[in-house]
Amino acid sequence: MPSRRSILMLPLSLGLPLAAAAVPTTGTPVLAGMTSRGEAVSLDALRGSVVLVFVWSARCPVCLDKLPELRRNLEGWQGKPFVILALNQDRSADEMLNYERALERTGAARAQLKNLWRGAADHRDNFGDLPQNMPTALIFDKAGALSQAVRGRVPAELWDDIAELVLG
């Protein structure tokens, strides 16, 4: 007989969307700060583009597994109104910067993927507490409204939803 815990963990292990209780469902979502390259970025300034906020940690194997997929998918979206904000929530910005330097050495860096550290003094968001040990993907439409929130593994179908928002 399955335990209650195993039943509750099933959707998560399958990568099914969970309610994003920490993400504001009313009011205007806020995300603003500086990228690791010193570029000011905010959801407000990105209106007119579909934005995927990918919350990750260098200590999260699932997160690290998904980051190359995000970069590969960006190749098909060059010149389109689509941006990925990779929001790192490690204790230190050094972990994010080490990852970014490795990308630059391999030529895998992408202009449409902007890295931000959630712990920076100039960072602001109203997303509340987000899980440290699993990725969280937040999709904002061109008007800046939260369209979808997924915790855990990012399902392949999410890219179909993004395509509809970008091309629709």
Residue positions per predicted region:
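N-terminal secretory signal peptides and thylakoid transit peptides that target proteins
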Residues: 1-14
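N-terminal "domain-start" segment that seeds a small globular fold
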Residues: 18-43
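Conserved redox-active cysteine motifs that mediate thiol-disulfide chemistry
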Residues: 55-69
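Thiol-based oxidoreductase modules, predominantly thioredoxin-like and allied folds used
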Residues: 81-95, 110-120
